[in-house]
């Protein structure tokens, strides 16, 4: 993949973020997601790839665009797998909370795991813990290993986990051991990435979340020299069979980084919609301008770019009427 592709991809996440940001705090997650999806799909036409969506908005009969198997890009350029989440954290945007972002990962053809839409158990951590932890260990053992490797007391560890009822038993274990817990209302990809950013102050990300989001997070962590280990959690026979149909012969086995994103190059881009652990959100400025804050990374070179971009909104012709609502509001 050419290095110029990284900047092409981040322009796509920027537009999706700008499209969804006007819906922040309006209680309408479907409109926010729809705006991001429409903008992302339109912008993909200008990207120099022959891409196939392997993680997207659902199956062909479930989503009008960015569905699994859809071809995207200008169809001139390298053949690649594409994983997208136009709006990671739809509920976050609807409620005006933190950590929503627009996300894309691109890898060579056949690299990305076709993750089924089900829960996945996850253990994510930064470079200092790579190769030292196993998702198969009891949580108490994992925390002790992490503390030893980081030269900390167990009670000084900070663990991030989604605030969900299904995590009640796991939270009890974390409380018993005595670690600090930072609950995340939503935003599974951002949560799994957080341990790789020292400024976030997170040592581990644990618990279960969406399998497609796990692949996106693994792509990011490869660029950040972190690691994500995972296990699919099929809820019934139908979900188990779905895994097998998608080529995962043993759905319960541990999935490594190589299983999820392959051994080749990966490009990851994300643009903040609302402020988060490591990205700022969309900010509306005077004179019909807006500022976005993005990250774009490439595994091959380990280059990590944080990009602040000023946009003149009337020139964003691909944006929907939702943006016009925000623009008119900024003039009042």
Q: Language-model features: where?
A:
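Short capping/connector residues at structural and topological boundaries
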Residues: 71, 97, 106, 128-130, ...
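Flexible glycine-/small-residue-enriched beta->alpha junction loops
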Residues: 107-134
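DPxDG-like acidic metal-binding loop motif
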Residues: 77-88, 92-111
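N-terminal subdomain of lithium-sensitive/metallo-dependent phosphomonoesterases centered on the IMPase/IPPase/PAP
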Residues: 1-83, 144, 148, 189-190, ...
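A short glycine/serine-rich beta->alpha loop
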Residues: 3-7, 27, 91, 130-132, ...
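A short local loop/turn or secondary-structure capping micro-motif enriched for an aromatic residue
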Residues: 101-102, 122, 313-316
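Short basic, glycine-rich beta-strand/loop surfaces that mediate nucleic-acid
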Residues: 72-73, 103-105, 201-205
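An extended, acidic
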Residues: 136-289, 293-298, 308
């Amino acid at each position: 993949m050419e290095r110029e592709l990284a900047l092409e991809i981040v322009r796509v996440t920027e537009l999706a973020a700008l499209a969804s940001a006007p819906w922040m705090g309006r209680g309408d997650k479907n409109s926010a997601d729809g705006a991001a999806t429409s903008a992302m799909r339109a912008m993909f036409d200008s990207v120099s790839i022959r891409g196939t969506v392997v993680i997207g908005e659902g199956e062909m009969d479930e989503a009008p665009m960015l569905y699994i198997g859809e071809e995207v890009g200008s169809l001139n350029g390298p053949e690649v797998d594409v994983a997208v989440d136009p709006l990671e954290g739809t509920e976050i945007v609807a409620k005006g909370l933190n950590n929503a972002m627009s996300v894309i990962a691109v890898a060579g053809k056949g690299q990305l795991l076709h993750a089924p839409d089900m829960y996945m158990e996850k253990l994510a951590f930064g470079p200092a813990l790579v190769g030292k932890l196993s998702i198969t260990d009891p949580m108490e053992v994992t925390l002790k290993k992490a503390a030893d490797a980081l030269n900390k007391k167990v009670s000084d560890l900070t663990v991030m986990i989604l605030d969900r009822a299904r995590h009640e038993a796991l939270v009890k274990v974390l409380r018993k051991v005595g670690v600090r817990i930072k609950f995340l209302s939503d935003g599974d990809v951002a949560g799994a990435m957080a341990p790789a950013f020292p400024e976030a102050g997170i040592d581990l990300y644990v618990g279960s979340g969406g399998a497609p989001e796990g692949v996106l997070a693994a792509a990011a962590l490869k660029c950040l020299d972190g690691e994500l280990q995972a296990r699919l959690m099929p809820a019934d026979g139908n979900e188990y069979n779905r895994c097998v149909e998608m080529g995962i012969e043993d759905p319960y086995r541990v999935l490594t980084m190589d299983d999820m994103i392959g051994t080749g190059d990966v490009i990851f881009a994300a643009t903040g919609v609302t402020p988060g652990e490591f990205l700022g959100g969309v900010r509306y400025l005077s004179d019909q301008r807006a500022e976005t804050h993005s990250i774009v990374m490439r595994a091959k070179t380990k280059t990590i770019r944080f990009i602040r971009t000023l946009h003149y909104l009337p020139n964003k012709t691909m944006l929907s009427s939702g943006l016009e609502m925000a623009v008119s509001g900024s003039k009042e």
